[in-house]
Amino acid sequence: MSSKVPFPPRLPLPSSHLPLTLISLEDWALVTLNGADTVKYLQGQLTCDVASLDADRFSFAAHCDAKGKMFSHLCVFHHHDGMAFIERRSVRDSQLAELKKYAVFSKTTITADDDAVLLGVAGFQAQAALGGLFTSVPNAAHPVAHHQDTTLLYFSLPAPRFLLITTPAVRDALQHKLEGQAQLNDSQQWLALDIEAGYPVIDSANGTQFIPQAANVQALDGISFNKGCYAGQEMVARAKYRGANKRALYWLAGKASHPPAAGDDLELKMGDNWRRTGTVLAACQLEDGSVWVQAVLNNDLASDSLLHVRDDSAGALSVQPLPYAIGE
């Protein structure tokens, strides 16, 4: 099986009903960085504290423009002899063009890596399923593990799951080992889990539209307010210390005539009328026919609000509780 070919699609399930599942991550992409100045360079570009990142931990982060608007939301970690991060494939080319602008002055090589396989493992007894192939499996205390050519990431939300950066051979071996035990699915299942977890999904339609706090990046420890300068720092700090941010990321669920696209508008029920509000970041339709939407909305939105996709009069979406506190 080619590393570029996704697993056969099936409609996603919520984490509470998900059997053991191997998930192809064709909608995500890997970037690797190597060289003596790699950590220093990333430290000046990303919102998180890359310099303090241990080899057994990852960090969420945003890469912003000078106005503090996100090119992308990413997950950064140690990988082989350097660093790496994973982001949505739709933003990688444009984000890399920005990231590389000043790299010519640093000893770091930045590569879009499509040779590695990105594989999700989620659902019932996912951790036990990996134990037979890997001597070291990550957990909540040590969310990153390294085993030969594979880096394994552990995500606690919405339920324990794993992301493997590996080789086609390891992917095939894992698929063979779990044949008859695990179902297969494409990246829509991983997207559904990210929506349920409240992990921001920034696709190309929403590039440079939002500051990190509008997508709850601070709630996921993806912003350091103590490190030195980085791109967009002034605006990100202003949002925290001057209360400049009025938006937050939400998980909505309900019915819609079709899953909205990234960048689509929503409407909020106000008495007998509907008022345009917010922006869709991501959406998916589940096996039971319901639709999940991740959206940026005003951060004073009432928990009992009723919304729908713009002009979808038959739709009805309600706010779902996120598994973390948003904070500032």
Curated annotation (Swiss-Prot):
- What broad class describes the main subcellular location of this protein? cytoplasm
Q: Does the keyword tRNA processing apply?
A: yes
Compartments it resides in: Cytoplasm
Family matches, as SUPFAM superfamilies:
Aminomethyltransferase beta-barrel domain, Folate-binding domain
Q: Name one GO molecular function term.
A: folic acid binding
Q: Which GO terms describe its cellular component?
A: cytoplasm
What are the UniProt keywords, alphabetically? Cytoplasm, Folate-binding, tRNA processing
Q: Which GO terms describe its biological process?
A: iron-sulfur cluster assembly; RNA modification; tRNA processing
Amino acids binding folate? 28, 190
Read off the Pfam families from this record.
YgfZ_barrel (PF21130)
> Highest taxon of the source?
Bacteria
Please state which protein family the record places this protein in: Belongs to the tRNA-modifying YgfZ family.
What does this protein's UniProt record list under function? Folate-binding protein involved in regulating the level of ATP-DnaA and in the modification of some tRNAs. It is probably a key factor in regulatory networks that act via tRNA modification, such as initiation of chromosomal replication.
Write the protein's name. tRNA-modifying protein YgfZ
